[in-house]
Amino acid sequence: MKIAYLGPRGSFCSVVAETAFVSEELFAYDSILDVIEAYDEGKCDFALVPIENSTEGTVNMSIDKIFHDSKATVVAEFVLPISQNLLALSKEGKIEHIYSHPQALAQTRNYLREHYPQAKVEITDSTSAAAEFVKNHPDLPIAAVANSYAAKMYDLEIVAKNIQDLAGNSTRFWLLGKEKKSFDLLKTGEKVSLALTLPDNLPGALHKAISVFAWRDIDMTKIESRPLRTRLGQYFFNIDLVNNEKNNLKIPYALEELSGLGVKVRLLGNYAVYSLGEG
């Protein structure tokens, strides 16, 4: 079985991939678009991508690619607590440049401003790439923001642990495939994810669409708009619903009512949610 994921090794996505797929073939790709396209082109059986961070919000590239260009289905979700660390070759060295992925830098913005106000921030494709860059340039006064996994991989010192600005920082990862898949991990619940496109000629369309879930007591954990890429002011709505034994019977009727209102519904996935240890 082949699994595509957002690499390189040492990234948070690779931590999830190696935890969930202990004995499968793992293939790292350079971008989210490449990961999803690898699945769509039949190069792998599953694709693993980040979908949302609790601090920085939705990973727009993932949801947009899935909605606009892919027929992939969400078959599982993994939630990984994110622990960012400052890594360098030595704890005693001077730090003039700090490298990392934009989201990692955003998650540690306050810490870096307070402790390294003169350091210049440099962007890399991933946290792991930042750690690798530091490893390969021992003569430069540089550091990386990355996880402890990357520190071990590239033999770097952890200058400071848990430097993220907000406690409880976590990232959701979606596993894309054809059929629902279960894992020997801590299961915390079930979800249904939808993409709704509202009709132009229905006054109060969004309110009416949401109401089909509200009056049935179906819990909605997320709603967010994204551009339809048609014209300004046109959106689709990404919605996550709590799925359980009670809601499992109600959701099909809610979807039927949405269709009756003229709302286009795409089922992105019906899947289990798993909680992983700290990354």
From Swiss-Prot:
GO CC aspect terms: cytoplasm
Originating species: Lactococcus lactis subsp. lactis (strain IL1403)
GO molecular function: prephenate dehydratase activity
UniProt catalytic activity: prephenate + H(+) = 3-phenylpyruvate + CO2 + H2O
Lineage summary: Bacteria, Bacillati, Bacillota, Bacilli, Lactobacillales
The name this protein goes by in its record: Prephenate dehydratase
Pathway stated in the Swiss-Prot or TrEMBL entry: Amino-acid biosynthesis; L-phenylalanine biosynthesis; phenylpyruvate from prephenate: step 1/1
Taxonomy, superkingdom: Bacteria
Gene3D superfamilies for the chain: 3.30.70.260, Periplasmic binding protein-like II
Pfam families in the cross-refs: PDT (PF00800)
Alphabetical UniProt keywords: Amino-acid biosynthesis, Aromatic amino acid biosynthesis, Lyase, Phenylalanine biosynthesis
Site residues, Essential for activity: T171
Residues covered by the ACT domain: 194-270
Enzyme Commission number(s) from the entry: 4.2.1.51
The Prephenate dehydratase domain, residue ranges: 2-178
Keyword Amino-acid biosynthesis: yes
BP-aspect Gene Ontology terms: L-phenylalanine biosynthetic process
